[in-house]
Structure formats: C-alpha cells, structure tokens
Amino acid sequence: DMASLATGSVNFPTNIYENPPDFVEGLARSMLEYGIKPEIEVFDLAMLYNAANLAKKGLIEGPLHVQFVLGIANALPARRSVFDFLRSELLQLLPDASWVAAGTGRFQWEVNQWCLEAGGHVRTGLEDNLKFDASRLAASNAELVAKVADACEGYDRHVARPAEARQLLGLAMAA
C-alpha cells in the first residue's frame, strides 16, 4: 500500500544514497500506476521541495505523507530548531500533508516526543534504533512501540487503530 520515496540523493557516511531526478520521477510514475502511496523521505530540505514539485507535476497524489529523517551523519541533524523549520516549510509548501519525523539511534525517543508535542505522527522501531534507553537494548519492536504508546497519554494523544491509520494516510480500507 505504501513505499518509501526519497526525492533526492544524500551522502551517507560510507556511501551515496543516489536518487537522481529522472530515477525519482520514474519511481513516482510507477507508484502512481500501481496505486502505491509514497512515504516521502526527507534527508535534506531540497527533498521536501522536490516532493512539492513532483506533486505539482501530478506524479504524486495528495495529500502527501512526509517523513523527516533526523540524526544521520551528513544529513539533517536531530536538533529541535531543524525539526521546527522543516515543519514550518512543510506547512507552507504542502499544508494538507501528514508528517512524521524519524530520529535515528540515540535520537529516536527525543524526536518521538517532539512529534507528539507538535501534532505529528510517530515512528519507532528497531530499524532506526536498537536501544530502549541509554542503559540497555530493546527487547523487541513491541517494547519500543509500547513506550511510545504509553507516552501518547501525556501529550493528550491516542494511538490510531489500523482503520484510523489507513484513513489518516489516505489508504483504502483493508479487505
């Protein structure tokens, strides 16, 4: 139903995540053809503008779902001022978009809290972070999800049920 779409390239510490414009447009066309909703991955500000341009060209249908990826070396730092700026730009460019921020590694929990506070969605799990806290490894994805779910109450937020999540993301209901 969904797949990641990075709308530009980024220099990772040991390699280049290469996504030239013609490749990105081809992926967007294929996703549109097969009814796959892109999760726009934003590793730098230009990727947000690239996504807006793809939407203007009709290669991505709205409302978009955008994920800011914070805390990877050579990309966006996990700083609150950067997070706030990205949200501000998103609201100006794509006001109907849903959004989430992913904090990698030691930044995951802090970025989760920023998202809850600012009205965004939350991403958690072992793909981005192996630790439950500074003192120990997470036992499972479920443990990390439970940590975020428990935190929702403190921000007057609730955990979406699958049908609600599909609706929020603009996905067809599951059969």
Model-derived regions: residue spans:
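Short Asp/Glu-rich motifs
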Residues: 50, 134-135, 171-172
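Substrate-binding groove of N-acetylhexosamine-processing glycoside hydrolases
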Residues: 89, 164-169
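Acidic/aromatic/glycine-rich contiguous surface patches that form carbohydrate-binding/processing clefts
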Residues: 145, 149, 167-173
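C-terminal helical cap(s) of enzyme catalytic domains, especially alpha/beta-barrels
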Residues: 133-157
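Flexible, glycine/charged-enriched surface loops at secondary-structure junctions
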Residues: 41, 155-164
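Catalytic alpha/beta core domains of metabolic enzymes, predominantly
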Residues: 2-127, 138
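Positions that flank functional sites
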Residues: 46, 130, 167
